[in-house]
Amino acid sequence: MEKRVLVIEDYSSIGNCSLTAGIPILSAFGTYPVGLPTALLSTQTAGIKGFTFVDLCDNMIPAYKHWKKLGIKFDCVYIENDKGRNRS
């Protein structure tokens, strides 16, 4: 049985990073990744100015509580480290 991994990262609509990269990589390792986005960005932040940013943190706990009501459990959690990220 596949291990279910909760992936907590932002979602960059354009770029090869964040949830768009993490989910397929974890899936390739034979896990069942479930994304919990922290934010929605128009593009990745590295080297790109003027991107748009929508904070989704207020939705994280309600989403998790919904999964809990459904009996969904996770074997492990992967949390993005965005230390030093430029949000300009």
Regions found by a protein language model. Give the residues of each.
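Ribokinase/PfkB-type carbohydrate-kinase core domain
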Residues: 2-88
